[in-house]
Amino acid sequence: MLTMKPSPDNDASIAQLADLFHLLGDPTRLRIVLSCLAGPIPVGEIAGGLQLSSSLVSHHLRLLRAARIVKAERQGKQVFYSTADAHISGVLTDMLDHIAEPTNGIDP
């Protein structure tokens, strides 16, 4: 499958990226996605770890799933969530590494 690489001249790609960054710009959603980095995790465990209601976490997960940021896998009565693919995991891991780096004299 051949896909077009996003470029500054491709308005559709820019709009999609802006939507993704908008979704990830919400601190609650970002915490939820980061909870999914380590592997499949059920909604209740995400909610408990973040001290949020399961219904609120489920709402955010629906948005994140629609944007292909997370994926869901049903196992019996529970649904487990994880990051959608290596691209999403890589971007988040790289950004976490980036903010952990010393500034080396660069003004924030």
Where in this protein do the model-derived segments appear?
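Residue-level detector of secondary-structure transition/capping positions
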Residues: 40-41, 65, 96
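Alpha-helical residues within the helix-turn-helix
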Residues: 48, 59, 65-66
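Alpha-helical and His/Cys-centered functional microenvironments
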Residues: 63-64, 82, 102
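N-terminal helix-turn-helix DNA-binding core of bacterial DNA-binding proteins
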Residues: 12-55, 75, 79-87
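Amphipathic alpha-helical dimerization/coiled-coil segments
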Residues: 1-16, 85-108
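Intrinsically disordered, low-complexity cationic segments
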Residues: 58-59, 97
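Extended rod-forming repeat segments used as scaffolds/tethers
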Residues: 33, 66-67
